[in-house]
From Swiss-Prot:
GO terms of biological process kind: endonucleolytic cleavage in 5'-ETS of tricistronic rRNA transcript (SSU-rRNA, 5.8S rRNA, LSU-rRNA); endonucleolytic cleavage in ITS1 to separate SSU-rRNA from 5.8S rRNA and LSU-rRNA from tricistronic rRNA transcript (SSU-rRNA, 5.8S rRNA, LSU-rRNA); endonucleolytic cleavage to generate mature 5'-end of SSU-rRNA from (SSU-rRNA, 5.8S rRNA, LSU-rRNA); small-subunit processome assembly
Keywords from the named record: Nucleus, Ribosome biogenesis, RNA-binding, rRNA processing
Location, primary (coarse class): nucleus
Biased composition (Polar residues): 267-284
Protein name per UniProt: Pre-rRNA-processing protein ESF2
Subcellular location, record wording: Nucleus, Nucleolus
Its biological purpose: Involved in the small subunit (SSU) processome assembly and function, and in the 18S rRNA synthesis. Required for the early cleavages at sites A0, A1 and A2.
GO molecular-function terms, A-Z: RNA binding
Taxonomic placement: Eukaryota, Fungi, Dikarya, Ascomycota, Saccharomycotina
Species the sequence originates in: Kluyveromyces lactis (strain ATCC 8585 / CBS 2359 / DSM 70799 / NBRC 1267 / NRRL Y-1140 / WM37)
Length: 293
């Protein structure tokens, strides 16, 4: 099994309950069962015709060289491989649970016991689950949650579903997957094209949601940047206005001289007591007074 099938993103398994292709009503189931029975009858008739063709005697055999015979064999083998899918009705089975750490090659080997498997698709676990398991010290191997397998013959798909569903894988007792229980369901009326169409549809929806989230994030970022720039511009305008006001106040301010008001004094006898100033006595008078006392 190539890696490309296991790495492709798949739709969530919870949405399969709403999918009318996988789960149908009673009337739809009757129609599907009748359709399957008709396909089985057609397939059985084709197989009977092939057996009759093989049993017919080869009366018209032409003598050919060994090289020509070998080329004819190769041509018939290629034609048989290309026509095998068109001759037989394919059948698809759904695996709701894949044993832990089982690789697609191992699962293909198990399913091949019941018939030839054409295509196999397994859905990987989500990345955050894998990282959480590894971070907590768990196994680093890749796990698959669910899958789909397409058998070349529809009867092989039915046999696989009826045999493996609810039973252990078995095999040798020492096998790592001996006791793992398989959950397999045959999907009547379901073809591989339906699966790929739904996967493409789910991928388109996921991509549209992603684009919408990206556009919303870009819009929020642009609005945030615009608000930041506007805030800076408003702050600069306020600072400039404040600076201009301070400069205008300094220019308009008048220069005023201040004078110290002296106390009014008078030596006149008629002056009031609050303004009267006593004259200092002479030095000679002070000396005489000092000598007397």
């Amino acid at each position: 099994m190539s890696k490309e099938y296991s790495d492709v993103d798949d739709f969530a398994s919870d949405e399969e309950e709403d999918n009318q292709v996988l789960i149908t009503g009673k009337d739809a189931k009757k129609n599907v069962i009748q359709f399957d029975q008709e396909e089985d009858e057609e397939e059985q008739e084709e197989e009977d015709e092939e057996v009759q063709d093989e049993e017919e005697p080869e009366d018209k055999v032409v003598q050919l060289t060994e090289q020509q015979i070998e080329k004819e064999k190769q041509r018939r083998l290629k034609k048989l491989k290309s026509d095998k899918k068109t001759k037989h009705k394919t059948g698809v089975v759904y695996l709701s649970r894949v044993p832990p750490y089982m690789k697609p090659a191992k699962l293909r080997q198990i399913l091949t016991r019941f018939g030839e498997v054409d295509r196999l698709f397994l859905k990987r676990e989500e990345e955050h689950k894998h990282q959480q398991r590894v971070k907590s010290g768990g196994n680093k191997k890749t796990m698959f949650e669910e899958g789909w397998a397409e058998f070349i013959r529809k009867k092989d798909a039915k046999l696989c579903a009826s045999t493996l569903n609810g039973n252990i894988i078995g095999g040798k007792k020492g096998n790592f997957y001996h006791d793992d229980v398989m959950n397999v369901k045959y999907l009547p009326g379901f073809k591989w094209a339906d699966l790929t169409e739904q996967i493409a549809r789910e991928n388109d929806i996921r991509q549209a949601k992603l684009q919408l989230e990206i556009s919303q994030a870009n819009k929020l970022n642009a609005e945030f940047i615009h608000n930041v720039e506007k805030s800076k511009m408003v702050n600069k305008m306020k600072q400039s206005k404040k600076r201009n006001q301070q400069e205008s106040q300094q220019v308009d301010e008048e220069v005023r001289r201040t004078f110290k008001q002296r106390k009014v004094a008078s030596t006149r006898a008629s002056a009031p007591d609050s303004q009267r100033q006593s004259q200092p006595q002479s030095k000679a008078l002070n000396d005489v007074m000092h000598s007397l006392f």
